[in-house]
From Swiss-Prot:
Species name: Photorhabdus luminescens
Keywords: Flavoprotein, FMN, Luminescence, Monooxygenase, Oxidoreductase, Photoprotein
EC number, as in UniProt: 1.14.14.3
InterPro entries: Alkanal_monooxygenase, Bact_Lucif_Oxidored, Bacterial_luciferase_CS, Luciferase-like_dom, Luciferase-like_sf, Luciferase_bac/NFP
Full protein name: Alkanal monooxygenase beta chain
Amino acid sequence: MKFGLFFLNFINSTTVQEQSIVRMQEITEYVDKLNFEQILVYENHFSDNGVVGAPLTVSGFLLGLTEKIKIGSLNHIITTHHPVAIAEEACLLDQLSEGRFILGFSDCEKKDEMHFFNRPVEYQQQLFEECYEIINDALTTGYCNPDNDFYSFPKISVNPHAYTPGGPRKYVTATSHHIVEWAAKKGIPLIFKWDDSNDVRYEYAERYKAVADKYDVDLSEIDHQLMILVNYNEDSNKAKQETRAFISDYVLEMHPNENFENKLEEIIAENAVGNYTECITAAKLAIEKCGAKSVLLSFEPMNDLMSQKNVINIVDDNIKKYHMEYT
């Protein structure tokens, strides 16, 4: 089991843009000295539910601040970006960091963004797949020469070529059954979302297994990752109230067709929120449901920076104990 962090960079009545960005930098430098494997940064546009619209740019900055930890995008939305530009940036970051960059990518979850970036909603899945093929060709071979319904141009060299043989490690966010099935055929590991229920994550994991088996994908090589929100406090009610305030606007935006109160309670119950027993129990169950080999933690629901660091230290101590026991 490997452990990393992810940053959502939400802003609200208690956190302004500058504070969110400064905290991300400070926590990144702090955990670089610890035993965490990686840090991934969330992409969002046009709302307060994430102030980073360019996670590759932020990744480059954070890679420059650090020495050993891997850093990358959590959900770079390839459907609304030019695939060659993504490949160029990814290869450049892979070179500059000498292999510490990770490309987590995603389909677009918001129809408004598809319209804003002038992308055809009716062909969204096809566009996503074609974008990936261009990016993958560039990362694995250094070249691409697409001829499809969306992109067609002569063979080009994508410079610089990747530092890592085969390109940087890639993950795709599990945003739908279509994406999960597509990823399983390709053998691309998933990132399970923190706001999906355990039942949904279980369903995605089982569907991935079934499709991967059909296409002879070696599941032992697949290292799915699971996002978990963390707010540990022996005053369980305080932890839950803080987390509720942190995620409320996001739930309203991203889950408009679900009962607001029920969805909030579900997320709080199925992430590591509350006292020690509640946090451990919820995290273990979530991991068991989806079979993830890596866990990505966000401590952002905790308002106090020192409290975040204290809980990070607790997790780090457990990582050290885990490695001592199993290595």
